[in-house]
């Protein structure tokens, strides 16, 4: 279970503080205060999605229940939020990874991640323009204070854990008990023909559970010189699909 433990140590604290920050922004009315100075009708949702896609999804769900957005508006706003969260992933995961990959390989990785992320923005803009959505969301709700922020943080965090933790535990357990050897029997010859190490399957299989876990394992394998930068880059793209 050492592999799972390493993933949890790297990912779970980041996930928790991201959700906590998003809830603090909502419950302490930080978004409403900032909205007075930043005149953009999408800003509150963008701000929440930037720190946590989980909290952003919960926010949209609550706004839908309250009737502040319609079901027609939900999808383009969600795509807009996922574009912003994609920028978060690039800033806090892709770019730090790229520094260890080198300027050439790392630059290609970040560029492709950015271009893929831009698809969310393009889809959102086209839907908003074509259907002439008129979305104007402003946070005027009464603040629930620090208690409300902490309460919702743990509520959302444990919901994520119910899927994240079992997935990582199952995948890493199977890897540590021979799954990789079985997979290598089928794909090893092909990967060797491509001058790739079968070890990249560790990253790819982890990506089936969580791409964040795949990035964490990739950085560890790169630090220990088990995989080359090109192999890490290739495996991360496979894991992303």
UniProtKB/Swiss-Prot annotation:
Predominant place of localization: membrane
Signal peptide: none
GO CC term (a single one): plasma membrane
Keyword field: Cell membrane, Membrane, Transmembrane, Transmembrane helix
Disulfide bonds: none
Localisation per UniProt entry: Cell membrane
Key word Lipid metabolism present: no
Membrane topology: Multi-pass membrane protein
Segments passing through the bilayer: 1-21, 43-63, 75-95, 108-128, 160-180, 200-220
Protein family membership: To M.jannaschii MJ0871, MJ0880 and MJ1556.
PANTHER family: GATE DOMAIN-CONTAINING PROTEIN (PTHR38139), NUCLEOSIDE TRANSPORTER_FEOB GTPASE GATE DOMAIN-CONTAINING PROTEIN (PTHR38139:SF1)
Protein name: Uncharacterized protein MJ1589
């Amino acid at each position: 279970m050492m592999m799972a433990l390493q993933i949890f140590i790297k990912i779970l604290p980041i996930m928790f503080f991201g959700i906590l920050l998003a809830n603090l922004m909502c419950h302490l009315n930080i978004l409403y205060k900032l909205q007075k100075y930043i005149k953009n009708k999408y800003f509150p949702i963008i701000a929440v999605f930037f720190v946590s896609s989980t909290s952003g999804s919960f926010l949209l769900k609550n706004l839908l229940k309250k009737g502040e957005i319609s079901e027609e508006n939900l999808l383009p706003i969600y795509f807009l939020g996922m574009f912003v969260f994609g920028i978060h992933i690039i800033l806090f995961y892709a770019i730090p990874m790229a520094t260890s990959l080198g300027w050439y390989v790392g630059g290609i990785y970040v560029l492709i991640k950015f271009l893929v992320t831009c698809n969310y923005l393009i889809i959102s803009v086209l839907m908003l323009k074509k259907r002439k959505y008129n979305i104007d969301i402003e946070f005027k709700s009464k603040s629930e204070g620090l208690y409300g922020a902490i309460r919702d943080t743990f509520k959302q965090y444990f919901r994520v854990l119910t899927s994240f933790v079992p997935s990582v535990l199952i995948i890493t357990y199977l890897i540590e008990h021979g799954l990789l050897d079985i997979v290598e029997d089928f794909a090893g010859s092909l990967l060797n023909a491509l001058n790739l190490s079968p070890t990249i399957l560790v990253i790819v299989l982890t990506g089936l559970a969580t791409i964040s876990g795949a990035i964490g394992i990739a950085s560890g394998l790169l630090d220990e010189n088990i995989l080359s930068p090109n192999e890490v880059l290739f495996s991360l793209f496979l894991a992303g699909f």
